[in-house]
Amino acid sequence: MITVFTPTYNRGALLNRLYQSLCAQRYKDFEWIIVDDGSSDDTVSIVELLQSKHRNQDFPILYYRKENGGKHTAINVGVKKAQGDLFFIADSDDILPPNALQTIVKVWEQTKDDSSIGGICGFDGDLNGGGLIGTGFPKGIHLNKLSLADNNNISYIDGTTRQIRFGLGVEGDMKEVFRTSVLREFPFPEIKGESFCPEVLIWNRVASKYKLRHINKIIYLVEYQQDGITSAITRSRMDSPIATTMTYAEMLRYDIPLKIKIKSAVNYWRFYFCLSIEKRRQNKVKIASIWYMFLFLGYIIHVLDKHKV
């Protein structure tokens, strides 16, 4: 079984569209877990209406409400509640194409016995146009083939997120579907006073132990909302500097291209100066002294952020 998980905060009006895409799935053995991160809109009544209309036909709809703490804390709750072997995060403003879960399950049936594989990863598509977002796999690389029961083949390559991103140069949005057990092994840190944690912090930690099977298929359709987390990313990072600096500090320890490390060092200092003086003294997220040469540049960008954001 798959757990489709939706964290939501004041986005109740968008849930019906996602619900309709789940009803259209060709594969039906899944549960839909919604974790409401303390919404003040009518999310509760909207979910209750969906549940009464749906009556658990095909798949159950499970709703949990918690105090506001940020998307990452909602993910932690969802992972604890999940009954599925795989955990698919579907944001309230996005949808799944009808064959998404079917494709994932068919690939997973031939993958799950390999304990080095922590999940499946496909590509995102544009909800409004349907096209691939990003570069896809570069031409000329060797892709493996999976023969599925319906006589279709799927191209794939096994590798960590960093190998695919930085080694092969794949750009754009991808959708990771993890083993639920892997996310239980790597929960998001919940830091007092912070409501944001970059997902890449955990995805990188997962990549230090597990590969993903990256398939050449669109399994997720996205539409960015003007009030969404993507458009407010700088503000979110400024307001949650401990988790943010932790993310960039860990990036500096990985085997990644130098230009990415330099960018990470600059961003570390950029958000380090969002910490209070007391928290700077207490800061346990340290980086090697070689990266101190980027302190001044990071500070300049920090000052610009304060004027723009």
What are the language-model segments listed below?
Residues R65-A82:
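Glycine-rich, basic loop-to-helix element that forms the pyrophosphate-binding segment
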